[in-house]
Every structure is written in structure tokens, then in C-alpha cells.
């Protein structure tokens, strides 16, 4: 891994907006290095990490909400597997808005095969929200995801 430290660092950023958390919502995102036809030689890509932060709100009285934000990745065999979970939730005593927020970084260190200069590095991710108690149409969530990538020619 030490040979990657001198490689340029690039990020891929996404925002997933869930205006309602009813029905275990999910969104697909694509991590891409956007280096197609920008280099003269083939390259390797190291997907270093996936940083996730979120904030959201819920409404109600005497309300306990909780669930999990799951980040999954489609691996080379085509199977979508979770890379990690971040708990979400809160409690509210009276009729008002409650808020929740959180963040976590998942270290991946996944090295690609050599890519031709005329192809992009792509990796599909799935962002899912799982209801454990009370997450519904009166709850929302905005998720910010930053993938850190290193590129080696």
C-alpha cells in the first residue's frame, strides 16, 4: 500500500435526499474517477474510503424513532454487499420537530485491475434506510457521501 501514497487523491461526492422515510427507501449512486481519455497510459484505481454524514428531522409528540443507514457496494461478482451501517434516531417528548445527525468513515482499500485510458473506473453503491421503530412519512434524511480515490499510472 505504501506505493499508493504518492498517487494523486481524487474524490467523488454524492448527495442522497430522502424527503420521506416511509417504506425503507433506497438510492443508487455510482462512484466514478472521470478519467476517461484524460491520461495517456493505463492506470489503476484505489478506492480508499467511503465517508458518510447525514442529518434529518422528524415530527411528533412522545416519539421514539430509530433505524439504520446502510451503505452497500456492488462487488466484482455482481453481488451487492453492505460495507457498513450508521444508526439514526432520536426521541421527542412534545409535539415539535426533532433532529438527528451522524457520520462515519468506512475504509475500503480496494485496488482495481489496470484500466485502459478510454474507460472510467465505476463502482455502484446503494444507500438504504431501514426502519427499526417509527421512521415514516414524517421523517426525512439527507445523506452526503464522499469516496476517496487514488490514481496510479
From Swiss-Prot:
It comes from the Viruses. Its main location: host cell. InterPro entries: Nanovirus_C8 (IPR008706). The lineage of its organism: Viruses, Monodnaviria, Shotokuvirae, Cressdnaviricota, Arfiviricetes. The keyword Magnesium does not apply. GO terms for cellular component: host cell cytoplasm; host cell nucleus. Belongs to the nanoviridae nuclear shuttle protein family. This is Putative nuclear shuttle protein. The gene is DNA-N.
Amino acid at each position: 500500500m505504501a506505493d499508493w501514497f504518492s498517487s494523486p487523491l481524487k474524490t467523488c461526492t454524492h448527495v442522497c435526499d430522502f424527503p420521506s422515510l416511509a417504506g425503507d427507501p433506497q438510492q443508487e449512486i455510482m462512484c466514478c474517477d472521470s478519467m476517461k481519455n484524460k491520461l495517456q497510459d493505463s492506470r489503476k484505481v484505489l478506492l480508499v474510503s467511503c465517508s458518510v454524514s447525514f442529518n434529518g428531522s422528524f415530527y411528533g409528540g412522545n416519539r421514539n424513532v430509530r433505524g439504520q443507514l446502510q451503505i452497500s457496494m456492488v462487488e466484482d461478482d455482481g453481488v451487492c454487499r453492505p460495507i457498513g451501517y450508521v444508526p439514526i434516531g432520536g426521541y421527542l417528548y412534545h409535539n415539535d420537530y426533532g433532529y438527528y445527525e451522524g457520520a462515519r468513515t468506512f475504509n475500503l482499500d480496494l485496488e482495481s485491475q489496470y484500466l485502459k485510458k478510454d474507460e472510467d473506473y465505476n463502482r455502484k453503491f446503494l444507500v438504504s434506510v431501514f426502519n427499526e421503530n417509527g421512521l415514516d412519512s414524517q421523517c426525512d434524511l439527507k445523506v452526503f457521501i464522499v469516496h476517496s480515490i487514488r490514481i496510479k499510472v
